[in-house]
Amino acid sequence: MTGNQKPNRVVVIGGGYAGALAANHVRMRDDMAVTLVNPRPKFVERIRLHQHAAGNYDAAIGYDSLIGDDVRLVVDTATRIDAVARTVELASGDTLDYDYLIYAVGSTGTIPASVPGAAEFAYPLAEFEQAERLAARLADVPLSAPM
């Protein structure tokens, strides 16, 4: 980047696998200023949530070990994207301006309503909070209980 030129502002919404990888890739260019927006302060290894629920692995990893020092982490939730104004509104009331936007919010698991009792008794493992819920339940189950 030359003298008075301002860096392009890149906002990445979503700090999962795709968002963290995109932020790290884009930051390698010296003409980009990268902001990563994620509702959690830690990266969640979704493929390890079953181990987290069983108490064998901590699936939450600090972003300081995953993203470059020059990536700004904003722990917040994007609530609105204004493509004309090139802004992202956050749940906190803050607004981020961008030149480029990467939308990498990932996926979520759902419990089918067509399965009787699933909503009340199933423990899905698609999200960190779900793994925490199952871990708490498993901690209450005696070791002798059948599973």
Segments predicted by a language model, with ranges:
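FAD-binding core/adjacent interface of flavoenzyme oxidoreductases
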Residues: 1-7, 72-146
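Beta1-alpha1 glycine-rich phosphate/pyrophosphate-binding loop at the start
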Residues: 2-72
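Short beta-strands and strand-loop turn motifs
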Residues: 46, 146-147
